[in-house]
């Protein structure tokens, strides 16, 4: 079972809102997930990102692989640097 940290889309048509979730890569994008780590709203200026930093670091240390978009969000929040230092 390969676990990914990725975005699950929500919101209305043309008004996306995303949840940062941990999910098995075999599950559908907006389907079942293991744990919710935060939220991302790209429509706000600047984009709103909230993360549970401790849980995110815990999953990264367990071997969960973030998608490219989530990795970019982790870098902007400073979580990726903390993960690399550990």
From Swiss-Prot:
Pfam families in UniProt: Ribosomal_S16
Ribosomal protein among keywords: yes
Cited SUPFAM superfamilies: Ribosomal protein S16
Keywords, alphabetical: Ribonucleoprotein, Ribosomal protein
GO molecular function, one term: structural constituent of ribosome
PROSITE patterns xref list: RIBOSOMAL_S16
GO biological process, one term: translation
InterPro entries: Ribosomal_bS16, Ribosomal_bS16_CS, Ribosomal_bS16_dom_sf
GO CC annotations, alphabetized: cytoplasm; small ribosomal subunit
Keyword Ribosomal protein: yes
Recorded family membership: Belongs to the bacterial ribosomal protein bS16 family.
NCBIfam families reported for this sequence: S16 (TIGR00002)
Name assigned to this protein: Small ribosomal subunit protein bS16
């Amino acid at each position: 079972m390969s676990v990914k940290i990725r975005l699950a889309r929500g919101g209305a048509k043309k008004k996306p809102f995303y949840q940062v979730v941990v999910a098995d890569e075999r599950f559908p994008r907006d389907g079942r997930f293991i744990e919710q780590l935060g939220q991302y709203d790209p429509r706000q200026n600047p984009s709103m990102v909230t993360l549970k930093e401790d849980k995110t670091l815990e999953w990264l240390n367990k071997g969960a692989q973030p998608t490219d978009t989530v990795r970019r969000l982790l870098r902007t929040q400073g979580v990726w640097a903390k993960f690399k230092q550990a």
